[in-house]
A protein has these predicted regions:
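Short, basic/glycine-rich phosphate-binding loops at helix/coil junctions
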Residues: 1-9, 57, 79, 153-162
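Conserved, helical-rich catalytic subdomain that frames metal- and/or nucleotide-binding sites
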Residues: 89-190, 205-239
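Conserved glycine-rich beta-strand-loop-beta hairpin in the small C-terminal domain of fold type I
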Residues: 198-199
Length: 239
């Protein structure tokens, strides 16, 4: 395995290698695979980069070896590798519960753009979980807010966004709290930390709105990397 774009392990310390090794074991294959990973999603950013890499590897090797496994079977195997891996077999959107192994494909009414602001630091999940407190739960947040699925605009969507690990991330990494505050101050609707990672995000309804916000954020003097991305739909994901 070779990797460009990030300094990552290329042995079993990488989810891609572990996923392929596990698939080979279960499928009874002894053939090797030459893997070249072009890393574009920031590492430890709370964006599921490693998990999506593992899922992509399983899909690619399944095709390479003519295994013809179902996506459900690959997702179950992926759950052995990492809790977030099964999600990426039910794209573009899904409701995920339990440890991550229960995945229900769903459809969000909202489609738009998201501005991502990634700090240049590695946020360790174990450290974040160690800083989590029961009081971080928001009793006003439904397990699956129905409005999250039906929100038609970014403003409506923002009213339902919640990250139960956001406070823990800020306690573990105070610089993330500062970044969250800076981005929120320049946004028209607030900002949120993605997962247990180093990325703050803001939803926008159009490419123009996202570009304006990205320009403002790039001018705030931070070393963070600012990107704009578009939400996936079924057609885009299939490609």
């Amino acid at each position: 395995m070779r990797c460009t774009g990030a300094d990552l392990p290329t042995d079993s310390g990488n989810l891609v290698v572990r996923a392929i090794e596990r698939l080979a074991e279960v499928a009874g294959r002894n053939a090797g695979v030459d893997v070249e990973l072009h890393k574009r999603i920031p590492v430890a950013a709370g964006l599921g980069g490693g998990s999506s890499d593992a899922a992509s590897a399983l899909l690619a090797v399944d095709e390479l070896w003519n295994l013809a496994w179902s996506r459900e079977a690959l997702a179950r195997l992926g759950a052995e590798i990492g809790s977030d891996v099964p999600l990426f077999f039910s794209m573009p959107s899904a409701l995920v519960t339990g440890r991550g192994e229960r995945v229900e494909p769903t459809r969000l009414a909202w489609r738009g753009w998201i501005v991502l602001v990634s700090a240049k630091l590695e946020v360790l999940t174990d450290r974040v979980y160690a800083m989590w407190r029961p009081s971080d739960r928001d009793p006003g947040v439904e397990a699956v807010p129905s409005g999250l699925l039906t929100a038609a605009t970014a403003d409506e969507l923002a009213g339902y966004l919640h990250n139960g690990l956001q406070a823990a991330v800020q306690r573990a990494y105070p610089d993330m709290g500062c970044l969250l505050e800076e981005v929120g101050r320049r946004s028209e609707r607030g900002a949120w930390i993605s997962g247990a990672g180093s990325t703050v995000y803001v939803p926008c309804d159009s490419a123009e709105e996202a570009a304006r916000l990205a320009d403002r954020l790039r001018g705030m003097g931070s070393t963070a990397t600012v990107r704009t991305v578009r939400t996936l739909d079924e057609t885009m994901h299939n490609h």
